């Protein structure tokens, strides 16, 4: 694992080429078909060197939860192990890693009809009134969720209306943890400025590769919008807004790079609190040797 632009893919490919391993992607952007440039999806040459499982498995119009990922990843792990190989899980979506390793609470799946009901109530009464409802049924979640956070507020109310139990009650029970021994590594530059520079350089390369054209094609479909999880991925939202005329090109670049740096900051915050983590420095010689030594 590691922040965006830290060199995870390069190290994983080296590992897959030199050892009996197969790669499983742990990335909430790489799951989407047609989102190749802005997600930094491995190139055709890279995929030929080391095929990645769990990429291009959803249309951008579809949702994909941490629970979906956990089920899919466990199935892939079991298949790889049955082939006598070692699974290598690579990515930066920390919520997916956490769900896989620790298990998940048995929350109900989304119900579009109930979500529509909640949205209609919010349109009529305001989110503050719905927050009052949540405080009555789940004071713990109400304390944690701000009235100005409609996505999380709606989900907490939805869970209660589907199950008759509060999110707090349901999250006290988790599915079983992953039944495998896992050696965990994080890779990141030692200096923050190095990572910031890498992020800016990579976004410039994405634009040269046709990132704006990719977003233009996604917009032209007509069934996608900025409220979808796929279009909330960093870079895609800013390019979309630029194409809508919300700001100029230079501002788009500035906003996209800033959003990516914020993502990297959040990823590093997760990783610094992660237990049993072995750290590698991006670009350092001997990373593969260090990694293999720790795995023995």
UniProtKB/Swiss-Prot annotation:
Region (Interaction with substrate tRNA): 27-30, 151-155, 232-237
An example molecular function term from Gene Ontology annotations: ATP binding
Gene Ontology biological process: tRNA modification
Site annotation Interaction with substrate tRNA: residues: 93, 115
First-tier enzyme category under EC: transferase
Ligand binding (ATP): 2-9
Reactions accelerated catalytically: adenosine(37) in tRNA + dimethylallyl diphosphate = N(6)-dimethylallyladenosine(37) in tRNA + diphosphate
Residues annotated for substrate binding in this entry: 4-9
Reported cofactor(s): Mg(2+)
Keywords: ATP-binding, Magnesium, Nucleotide-binding, Transferase, tRNA processing
InterPro entries: Dimethylallyltransferase, IPT, P-loop_NTPase
One Pfam family linked to the record: IPPT
EC code: 2.5.1.75
Assembly information from the UniProt record: Monomer.
Purpose: Catalyzes the transfer of a dimethylallyl group onto the adenine at position 37 in tRNAs that read codons beginning with uridine, leading to the formation of N6-(dimethylallyl)adenosine (i(6)A).
Recorded family membership: Belongs to the IPP transferase family.
Protein name: tRNA dimethylallyltransferase
Species whose genome carries this gene: Shewanella baltica (strain OS195)
């Amino acid at each position: 694992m590691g922040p965006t632009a830290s060199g995870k893919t390069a190290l994983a490919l080296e590992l897959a080429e030199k050892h009996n391993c197969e790669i499983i992607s742990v990335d909430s952007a790489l799951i989407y078909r047609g989102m190749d440039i802005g997600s930094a999806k491995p190139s055709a040459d890279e995929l030929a060197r080391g095929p990645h499982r769990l990429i291009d498995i959803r249309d951008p119009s579809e949702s994909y939860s941490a629970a979906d990922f956990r089920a899919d990843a466990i199935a892939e792990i079991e298949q790889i192990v049955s082939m006598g190989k070692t699974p290598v899980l690579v990515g930066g979506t920390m919520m997916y890693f956490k769900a896989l390793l620790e298990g998940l609470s048995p929350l109900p799946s989304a119900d579009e009809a109930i979500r529509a009901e909640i949205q209609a109530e919010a349109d009529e009464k305001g989110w503050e009134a719905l927050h009052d409802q949540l405080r009555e049924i789940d004071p713990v979640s109400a304390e944690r969720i701000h009235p100005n956070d409609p996505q999380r507020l709606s989900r907490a109310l939805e869970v209660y209306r589907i199950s008759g139990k509060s999110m707090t009650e349901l999250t006290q029970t988790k599915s079983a943890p992953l039944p495998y021994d896992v050696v965990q590594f994080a890779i990141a530059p030692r200096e923050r400025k190095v990572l910031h520079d890498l992020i800016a350089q990579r976004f410039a390369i994405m634009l040269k590769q046709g990132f704006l054209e990719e977003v233009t094609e996604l917009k032209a479909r007509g069934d996608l919008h900025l409220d979808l999880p796929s279009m909330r991925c960093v870079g895609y939202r800013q390019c979309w807004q630029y194409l809508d005329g919300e700001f100029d090109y230079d501002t788009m670049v500035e906003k996209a790079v800033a959003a990516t740096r914020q993502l990297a900051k959040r990823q590093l915050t997760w990783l610094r609190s992660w237990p049993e983590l072995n750290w590698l420095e991006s670009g350092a010689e001997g990373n593969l040797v260090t990694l293999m030594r720790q795995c023995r």
